[in-house]
């Protein structure tokens, strides 16, 4: 199968979308699929392009068998909403154009946030006559409103309408939590269209370690049951 994946972030960037996308694509390559990722020059979160890269109109490289196409975007730090929106829109445009000249895929995947990436993926699915899958890692723009980055406005309501449009136009929505699935169903999205695939872990890299008595003593945890949680969901 030929898979075309659009993502705003990809290694060497280190964040949730970059890691999740890379690990999934790497496993698909191991399974014998041909994977092409369209992304931008690595710059997150500072807005400065990583050493060894340039913000060019077109760059190609191969990472662990994944064909990576990097396109020009309006680069800015992860701070001002207006500038970040320009960044998102520029990737939507140039990511779409890059997708038009790739070998025709069997499936097109866009990951969100931000969902302008999925706008490009949906448009490509229309022009290339291929199914579009919406990967939902966070509820956007709801999360923007929740953290106070945007107030309720005409612009926000238009974004919410676009969000629902993309859900309905996708062949499937892949959500990372059951709560996201319930949220979409409550908003009128067909539950049969939604698949939950939670974030996983590479057990070849992460294994339980034997208890460290000296560390437990230092932290005054000797004889106590200790549980830790790392994550946002």
Predicted segments, located by residue:
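Conserved donor-binding/catalytic core segment of Leloir-type glycosyltransferases
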Residues: 220-233
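N-terminal subdomain of nucleotide-sugar transferases
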Residues: 1-64
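A conserved catalytic-core segment of Leloir-type glycosyltransferases
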Residues: 37-102
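Membrane-proximal helix-turn-helix segments that form the acceptor-binding/catalytic region
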Residues: 31, 96-100, 116-119, 123-127, ...
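An aromatic- and histidine-rich active-site surface loop
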Residues: 14, 84-100, 105-137, 141-142
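Acidic anion/phosphate-binding donor-loop and adjacent secondary structure
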Residues: 185, 191-192, 201-217
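Acceptor-binding helix/loop patch of EC 2.4 sugar-transfer enzymes
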Residues: 8, 73-83, 126-161, 204
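Carbohydrate-associated surface elements
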Residues: 179, 200
């Amino acid at each position: 199968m030929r898979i075309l994946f659009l993502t705003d972030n990809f290694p060497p960037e280190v964040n949730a979308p970059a890691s999740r996308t890379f690990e999934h694509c790497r496993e698909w390559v191991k399974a014998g699929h041909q994977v092409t990722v369209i992304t931008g020059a690595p710059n997150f979160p500072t807005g400065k392009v990583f050493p060894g890269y340039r913000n060019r109109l077109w760059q190609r490289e191969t990472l662990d068998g994944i064909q990576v196409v990097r396109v020009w975007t309006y680069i800015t730090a992860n701070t001002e909403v207006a500038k970040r929106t320009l960044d998102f829109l520029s990737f939507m445009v140039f990511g779409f154009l890059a997708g038009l000249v790739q070998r025709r895929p069997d499936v097109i995947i866009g990951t969100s946030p931000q969902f302008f990436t999925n706008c490009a993926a949906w448009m490509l699915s229309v022009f290339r006559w291929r199914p579009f899958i919406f990967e939902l890692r966070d509820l956007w723009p709801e999360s923007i409103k929740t953290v106070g980055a945007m107030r309720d406005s005409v612009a926000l309501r238009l974004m919410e309408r676009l969000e629902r449009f993309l859900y309905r136009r996708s062949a499937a929505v892949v959500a990372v939590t059951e709560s996201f699935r319930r949220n979409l169903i409550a908003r009128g999205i067909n539950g049969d269209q939604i698949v939950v695939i939670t974030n996983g872990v590479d057990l070849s890299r992460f294994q339980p370690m034997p208890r460290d008595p000296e560390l437990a003593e230092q932290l005054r945890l000797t004889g106590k049951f200790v549980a830790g949680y790392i994550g946002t969901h």
